[in-house]
Amino acid sequence: GYEGVDKRIDVLATAIHAGLKATQLKDLDLAYAPPYSSAKDPVNMAGFMIDNIAKGTLKQWHLEDMDKISKDKSVVLLDVRTVGEFNRGHMDGFKNIPVDELRERINEIEKGKPVYLICQSGLRSYIASRILEGNGYETYNFSGGFRFYDAVVNDRALIEKAYACGMDLSLIHISAPTR
């Protein structure tokens, strides 16, 4: 949502001015007001995510990887959203195992193949990634989640905003989600 965005911008501007590294955002001690924010501030959460990526704890895959991954049968494509979310729209070739069922259904995921994960925003696929990594799987989490993917596929102008820093958009082919 938009509530509190000004606070996050102030915090990030101060961090930039102070010369903090992105991985240090996780260590900021920010004011906590339960009615107005989560226990961990979104700035801290961004810092944790950046730290996980920097340390290699979390490996990501991106929108521009979609075409080469979806055609490659040497990987497992796994959507960990609820059945209802999956049925409202999903990427072609993805199997649906909700994260809440993952531990009980882990034997349905072929060992020895990298697992490419997606959920709605990234949290559940991160949790699934940790569960699978703990059981010997190599995992990659989709950056941005299905919400990002669906918005980009359904609004080409949005990708131009998302990649406004000079990326050649003609190199990106995006398949529409299955409905």
Show where each model-derived region lies.
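C-terminal catalytic lobe of FAD-dependent flavoproteins
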Residues: G1-L25
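Rhodanese-like catalytic fold shared by cysteine-dependent sulfurtransferases
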Residues: T23-P34, S38-V75, V83-Y116, Q120-L171, ...
